[in-house]
């Protein structure tokens, strides 16, 4: 009997027979993942190149591109529920790479009560989403995008800026005022505690952008224009002299303690690169699993992994992008070695199986689910065995 081969589910699909051959999708794609068929002129998607930024989806005038993450139906459904949950008519749309904590949002836009909507890239937000929000009672929309030069998807931030500018002109003509949609930009940067710096140079060695430099008398200075906020230098600093806005060491420690207390055993904590795993807008948390989403797998600190085990977590899974998919100059690939080194040390005391590192991509939505299911099964077996 021949083995049945099942096709891998993909996150983005193009209905080629309905394509109008307008060429907009492959003009905006930052990764050359969409090609023009030489004979028909229709769009063809090369899924292995696709990074699921959503730019093609938001730009297609014929609506022949489908995306399973944060599409029009899921976003508008979320807004309908969120208006009641947050009791607000102000919407704040944030790129995951630019968004500070909620207090930071308040400082940016001067709002204290709002509906938060965090997406991998604001470039995927279509005109229809803005119009649907306005026509269903949203009075004010704020958009927080990455600085144009720091967009993880290269073109998402500048494209959305132009889209919002054009839409504001239309909305003004329809009587919604001169700036119905407010756009601001933000990039999260590393922070230096000079009194703790020991001048070891680790940050200088590891940074993909040459942002840190040592100055006399051995104190690190950061070129903030060069810093892309991957967090690799923070994870590699032995003196805890560096921190990253919104992903500070103490904040992550607080989340670890909170999640360990919330979960039922066997407890699994997942450190995710937020570009490798896209969460659903309103996932009901599994009682055994919690997630800490990071700006890059490079921000995974082995001290946090040890801390998780110390607080009662039974298994830790690190989910990263493959090096070729990394949005931060392959910084995430440098996270694997320290995690595997810790795994080896844990193996010496019989705990190596309780830590795992995997690479996944949102283009294949089921891939992470499989990794988590396999790891969860292993941790459950260990828990049962040790509880016997």
Feature-to-residue mapping (PLM):
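Primarily the internal scaffold of c-type cytochrome electron-transfer domains
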Residues: 69, 73-85, 92, 246, ...
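Short alpha-helical segments and helix-capping/turn motifs at coil-helix boundaries
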Residues: 77-79, 126-129, 256, 301-303
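Iron-sulfur cluster-binding cysteine motifs and their immediate structural context
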Residues: 20, 24-46, 51, 55-73, ...
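Ferredoxin-type iron-sulfur electron-transfer modules and their immediate structural context
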Residues: 1-35, 87-131, 135-216, 266-297, ...
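Long C-terminal interaction/binding lobes of large macromolecular proteins
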Residues: 313-314
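Short secondary-structure transition/capping segments
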Residues: 40, 80, 153-157, 257, ...
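A glycine- and Lys/Arg-enriched "phosphate-lid" helix/loop adjacent to the NTP-binding pocket
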Residues: 324
């Amino acid at each position: 009997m021949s083995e049945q081969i099942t096709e891998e589910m993909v996150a983005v699909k193009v209905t080629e027979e309905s394509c109008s051959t307008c060429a907009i999708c492959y003009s905006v794609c930052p990764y050359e993942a969409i090609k023009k068929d030489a004979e028909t002129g229709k769009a063809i998607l090369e899924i292995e190149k696709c990074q699921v930024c959503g730019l093609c989806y938001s730009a297609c005038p014929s609506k022949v591109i489908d995306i399973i993450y944060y599409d029009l139906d899921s976003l508008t459904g979320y807004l309908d529920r969120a208006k009641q949950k947050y009791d607000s008519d102000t919407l704040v749309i944030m790129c995951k790479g630019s968004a500070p904590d909620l207090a930071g949002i308040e400082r940016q836009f001067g709002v204290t009560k709002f509906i938060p909507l965090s997406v991998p890239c604001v470039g995927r937000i279509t005109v229809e989403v803005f119009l649907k929000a306005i026509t269903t009672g949203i009075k004010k929309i704020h958009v927080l995008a990455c600085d144009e030069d720091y967009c993880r998807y290269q073109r998402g931030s500048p494209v959305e800026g132009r889209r919002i500018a054009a839409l504001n002109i239309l909305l003004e003509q329809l009587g919604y005022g001169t700036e119905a949609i407010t756009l601001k930009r933000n990039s999260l940067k590393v922070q230096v505690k000079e009194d703790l710096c020991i001048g070891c140079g680790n940050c200088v060695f590891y940074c993909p952008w040459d942002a840190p430099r040592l100055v006399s008398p051995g104190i690190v200075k950061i070129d903030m224009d060069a810093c892309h906020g991957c967090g690799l230098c923070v994870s590699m600093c032995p003196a805890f002299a560096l921190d990253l806005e919104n992903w500070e060491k103490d904040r992550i420690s607080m989340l670890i303690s909170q999640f360990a207390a919330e979960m039922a055993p066997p407890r699994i904590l997942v450190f995710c690169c937020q570009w490798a795993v896209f969460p659903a807008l309103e996932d009901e948390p599994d009682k055994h699993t919690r997630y800490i989403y990071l700006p890059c797998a490079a921000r995974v600190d082995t001290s946090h992994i040890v801390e998780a085990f110390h607080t009662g977590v039974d298994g830790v899974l690190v989910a990263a992008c493959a090096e070729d998919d990394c949005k931060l100059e392959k910084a995430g690939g440098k996270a694997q070695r320290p995690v595997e080194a810790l795994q080896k040390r844990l193996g010496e005391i019989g705990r190596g199986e309780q830590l795992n590192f995997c690479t996944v991509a949102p283009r294949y939505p089921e891939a992470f689910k499989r990794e988590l299911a396999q790891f969860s099964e292993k941790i459950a077996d260990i828990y049962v065995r040790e509880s016997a």
